[in-house]
Amino acid sequence: MSTTTSYKVFSGTNSRYLAEKICNSLGCELGNMNITHFADGEFAVSFEESIRGSHVFLVQSTFPNSDNLMELLLMIDAAKRASAKSIIAVIPYFGWARQDRKDKPRVSIGAKLVADLLSVAGIDRLITMDLHADQIQGFFDIPVDHLYASTIFLPYVQAMNLKNLVIASPDVGGSKRASSYAKYLDCPLVLCNKTRERANVVATMQIIGDVEGKDVIIVDDMVDTAGTITKAADIMKEAGAASVRAIASHCVMSGPASERVEKSLLEEMLFTDSIPYNNACPKVKQLTVADMFAEAIRRVMNNQSISDQYLI
């Protein structure tokens, strides 16, 4: 890398697997830091090498629980107190992003709160991928580099060479994302219209469009309990689809998700490795985003544009 200022990459406990791959792509060593856990549940963070005057990249997805967010905040605080030149949070999966608006009375807006916490802690820039809502970028008063998993998904889909390809959105809210995929791949778009009984429980779903004899790929930003995406797959197969696959950026896969995917009529469930997945569901496959994040880090360090990486 041709830059006059040093940079260092560190990772919290949650994303070390991805940070190591990012460092391999960058040709650098993952920085050494220590996270000490205490009997009362608290933990402390310390850098085990000098970061004075360095650009510090901190890799940590804020999932599956709030400990990972707190760990990242402590990493940021420690870096600031250790005289880092700049602090860049690399958050492959930005948790709390579904709480992006006040959609009913007396509710919190978790995404805005997390943005404020990160900013107050001391980050100078955020690099993230496929936020649940694009407007979350506006919650920050610092630069946000928003990457898209479509950069790796679209070539994968093209290589499948499906002759009767149809792109589907599992709900109306994801129609913009699915429409971009359909336009790039030059194929039809199908929508699903769903109603919920309560959070994570889909009551009814209807297909808007023709899937008979088609190879359907459902596109979403994340899969949580997999209720929506597996119900959509089953309904599309019942409507005559030749095959149904799904791709989603973030492998949240909580609760009964793995069992639902395994029992569903999905042929394949494709994710990135923004979140580790250790359940041995044979239908689940992960593509790494390490090279994409490494390239973003290179370009940040060299003051180059990131947008020309995007396919859509």
Protein language model regions, located:
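PRPP-associated nucleotide enzymes
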Residues: 1-312
